[in-house]
Curated annotation (Swiss-Prot):
Catalytic activity: N-terminal L-lysyl-[protein] + L-leucyl-tRNA(Leu) = N-terminal L-leucyl-L-lysyl-[protein] + tRNA(Leu) + H(+); N-terminal L-arginyl-[protein] + L-leucyl-tRNA(Leu) = N-terminal L-leucyl-L-arginyl-[protein] + tRNA(Leu) + H(+); L-phenylalanyl-tRNA(Phe) + an N-terminal L-alpha-aminoacyl-[protein] = an N-terminal L-phenylalanyl-L-alpha-aminoacyl-[protein] + tRNA(Phe)
Highest taxon, organism lineage: Bacteria
Subcellular location(s) per record: Cytoplasm
Keywords recorded for this protein, A-Z: Acyltransferase, Cytoplasm, Transferase
Protein name as it appears in the record: Leucyl/phenylalanyl-tRNA--protein transferase
Gene that produces this protein: aat
GO MF annotations in UniProt: leucyl-tRNA--protein transferase activity
EC number, as in UniProt: 2.3.2.6
Native organism: Pseudoalteromonas atlantica (strain T6c / ATCC BAA-1087)
């Protein structure tokens, strides 16, 4: 029987290759959600994912869902929407509101993995410059957005939401264009699903993903990309 690794006060994680196959990708439990631990985890392709009644669980799935920016799919109808929409898009204007909205979204599984502890941890990570948000506005009303972590020249997407049709897709479109400005090559989507696949997300063997991540982490992202502002249409 394989025993699950328990984290201690150090920032040490076991190698992702030691993750379980059942449940797939579960690597360790315990530890905390400090800024240093979160950044250390993401730099190694590891992320927390757990429910309110569970200990902190750490994952590194195989295969990994990634979105190569050159593979991002924009349908004709979405392009038309982007050209004509009155919706505005901003970066890092309302991170707190975005993560709270994502936590309220009803998922296929019961409950939410964005617990109060997770919310507080990622808000602190945002304040330290390690997590960022894209917001979509209808006049002054927040109608969509997404957030994620940047452990290097890669964006690790965490969650998205929308109250208006195509609002989350609009946020993704602007995110992709923003990342391209910094020479970023892919978004870490963690796990593949039908919605992400429709946008161009593919599955990649974990070992290959970790090699690409290792290179991306060597090159910090230009923080000027994340200055709070309204984004103009590319």
């Amino acid at each position: 029987m394989i025993e699950l690794f328990q984290l201690d006060k150090s920032l040490h994680f076991p190698p992702p290759a030691h993750a379980l196959t059942d449940p797939p990708g579960l690597l360790a439990f315990g530890g905390d959600l400090s800024v240093n631990r979160l950044l250390h985890a993401y730099q190694q392709g590891i992320f927390p994912w757990f429910s309110a009644n569970e200990p902190i669980l750490w994952w590194s799935p195989d295969p990994r869902g990634i979105l190569p920016l050159d593979n991002f799919s924009v349908s004709k109808s979405l392009r038309k929407f982007i050209r004509k929409t009155p919706l505005r898009v901003t970066v890092n204007r309302r991170f707190d509101e975005v993560i709270y909205a994502c936590a309220k979204v009803k998922r296929q599984s019961s409950g939410t993995w964005i617990t109060d502890d997770m919310i507080n941890a990622y808000i602190e990570l945002h304040r330290c410059g390690g997590a960022h948000s894209i917001e979509v506005w209808d006049d002054e009303e927040l109608v969509g957005g997404l957030y994620g972590v940047t452990p290097g020249n890669v964006f690790c997407g965490e969650s998205m939401f929308h109250y208006a049709t195509n609002a989350s897709k609009l946020a993704m479109f602007y995110l992709v264009e923003l990342l391209r400005l910094n020479g970023c090559e892919f978004i870490d989507c963690q796990l593949q699903n039908d919605h992400l696949a429709s946008l161009g997300c593919i599955e990649m063997p974990r070992a290959e993903f970790l090699n690409r991540l290792k290179e991306a982490v060597k090159h910090p992202m230009d923080q000027s990309l994340w200055l709070p502002r309204e984004l103009t249409q590319p």
